[in-house]
Amino acid sequence: AKILLETLRNLPEQPVNFTIEESSYSIEISSDNGRYKLSGENATDFPRVPSVSDGYSVNIPSEVLGTAISNTIYATSNDELRPSMTGVFLKLDETNTTFVATDSHRLIRYRRVDITSDMAHSMIIPRKALTLLKATLPTEATSVTMEFNTSNAFFDFNKVKMICRLIDERYPD
């Protein structure tokens, strides 16, 4: 999907024809500038999409979530030897929501008292997932439903659904 989007983005404004070959799971894109053939895979070869069984949910305004990501993501670590620090720690409780990021040189905490949860929960969301989420958040104000369990986080807004695997580590105290 990423290669398809990049190919279409780089084409000039002109008519484009798509030819889908279902037997080989390939797509051919034809335009005045040339022909591009992309191969695909059978959907049954991919793992099943996880479901949010035994999970919890919280609604976060898109502008609040975007601000929280912008204020914390730059301080995450690139050190893969310390995976807990390569994401943003999110802590929800009855009184507030806190986003924390550190690379061991900088420590950023962003707290909101207007977003709460009935029970205390905490998780580490990977930097890459938050970067993607920030890029897809709508510019107009909308509510983002975040559902989560012990291993995954599910973000749902407008017609966008995003699932990410949480980092299964203990965040430094």
Language model regions located:
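Structural preference for solvent-exposed beta-strand-turn elements
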Residues: A1-D173
